[in-house]
């Protein structure tokens, strides 16, 4: 073993330095979990910031794991109180918990001091949709994990699952209820069985279709017997149909995995789909059809469009609009 590295067979991993343990954890995130470079940098930055805090408060430039306890972590979060939002402090605590969970799993430490520290209360306001950049970050992170050599069929499934949800705007129950035969790869459409057993046809994008193709190919390779367990498109670890609860859990896991801390539900991805289409100038009636809404008023509640964006769409589309809104 090279000097300054952490060995799984060490007699007492708690005597390893923070930098040694951090390097091992970051390598795990990069090579074993296949996280994006941006997400890995965020984890590394959080761990470095804690080490710098320990240096400033305890005079230890590179503390040993045995020197860090729950009180030290509470002191760190308290020091961030004036300069960081609650969501930022919660993310940094989550990084420390993940770090110690990794070390616990490898029996390099006996306790997880971060697990003894409560998360800051974030309130009850739940964002109902994601911005375009955040959606791309989520889906690109899932894509990177699925494209990694040796990726499991479940990693590929998660990419396909959320690409399809964002691409089609279907309800979580409709997504979980899809069969393989509902996807028309040639026409780029999916058949959806909605509320009241009403069937509709919805376009699906090329990225989502590519993700589904990869998922099915890897599923056949790694879990060939799954096809004998029914016709479901998206399957759980036993090969059976995913439940809506599982989709909620998987989205929460993948959001955190890629460093997004919004409390977003699968229903929020449906809102996101509708909002992004309307922001780009799509017709509200067409969005209504794709969402499977009976009333246009329901579709309107799904969209979160800024006034300036509405003005741009209006000015571009209406033949008698005022092109100059400067007042001249």
Swiss-Prot record:
UniProt-recorded name of the protein: Tyrosine recombinase XerC
Gene (name only): xerC
Subunit structure: Forms a cyclic heterotetrameric complex composed of two molecules of XerC and two molecules of XerD.
Gene3D superfamilies cross-referenced by the UniProt entry: 1.10.150.130, Intergrase catalytic core (1.10.443.10)
Enzyme active site: 171, 195, 267, 270, 293, 302
Signal peptide: none
SUPFAM superfamilies given in the database record: DNA breaking-rejoining enzymes (SSF56349)
Cell location: Cytoplasm
Species this chain originates from: Syntrophobacter fumaroxidans (strain DSM 10017 / MPOB)
PANTHER family, per database record: PHAGE INTEGRASE-RELATED (PTHR30349), TYROSINE RECOMBINASE XERC (PTHR30349:SF77)
Keyword DNA-binding found: yes
Pfam families: Phage_int_SAM_1, Phage_integrase
Keywords assigned: Cell cycle, Cell division, Chromosome partition, Cytoplasm, DNA integration, DNA recombination, DNA-binding
One Gene Ontology MF term: DNA binding
Keyword Cytoplasm annotated: yes
GO cellular-component term (any): cytoplasm
Function of the molecule: Site-specific tyrosine recombinase, which acts by catalyzing the cutting and rejoining of the recombining DNA molecules. The XerC-XerD complex is essential to convert dimers of the bacterial chromosome into monomers to permit their segregation at cell division. It also contributes to the segregational stability of plasmids.
Core-binding (CB) domain sequence ranges: 16-104
Entry's family note: Belongs to the 'phage' integrase family. XerC subfamily.
């Amino acid at each position: 073993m090279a000097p300054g590295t952490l060995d799984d067979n060490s007699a007492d991993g708690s005597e390893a330095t923070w930098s040694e343990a951090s390097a091992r954890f970051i390598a795990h995130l990069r090579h074993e979990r296949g996280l994006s470079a941006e997400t890995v940098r965020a984890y590394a930055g959080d761990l470095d910031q804690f080490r710098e805090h320990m240096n400033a408060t305890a005079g230890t430039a590179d503390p040993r794991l045995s020197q860090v306890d729950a009180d030290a972590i509470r002191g760190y979060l308290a020091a961030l109180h004036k300069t960081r939002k609650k969501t930022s402090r919660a993310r940094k605590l989550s990084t420390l918990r993940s770090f110690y969970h990794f070390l616990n799993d490898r029996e390099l430490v006996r306790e997880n001091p971060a697990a003894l520290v409560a998360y800051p209360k974030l309130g009850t306001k739940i964002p109902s949709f994601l911005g375009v950049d955040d959606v791309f970050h989520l889906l690109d992170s899932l894509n990177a994990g699925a494209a990694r050599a040796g990726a499991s069929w479940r990693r590929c499934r998660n990419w396909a699952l959320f690409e399809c949800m964002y691409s089609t705007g279907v309800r979580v129950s409709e997504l979980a209820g899809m069969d393989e035969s509902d996807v028309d790869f040639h026409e780029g459409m999916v058949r959806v069985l909605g509320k009241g057993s009403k069937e509709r046809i919805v376009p699906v994008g090329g990225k989502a279709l590519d993700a589904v193709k990869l998922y099915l190919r890897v599923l056949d390779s790694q879990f060939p017997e799954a096809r004998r367990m029914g016709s479901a498109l998206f399957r759980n670890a036993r090969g059976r149909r995913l439940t809506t609860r599982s989709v909620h859990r998987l989205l929460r896991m993948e959001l955190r995995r890629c460093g997004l801390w919004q409390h977003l539900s699968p229903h929020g991805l449906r809102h996101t789909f509708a909002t992004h289409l309307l922001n780009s100038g799509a017709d509200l009636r067409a969005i209504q059809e794709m969402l499977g809404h009976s009333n246009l008023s329901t579709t309107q509640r799904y969209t979160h469009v800024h006034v300036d964006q509405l003005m741009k769409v209006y000015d571009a589309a209406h033949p008698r609009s005022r092109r100059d809104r400067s007042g001249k």
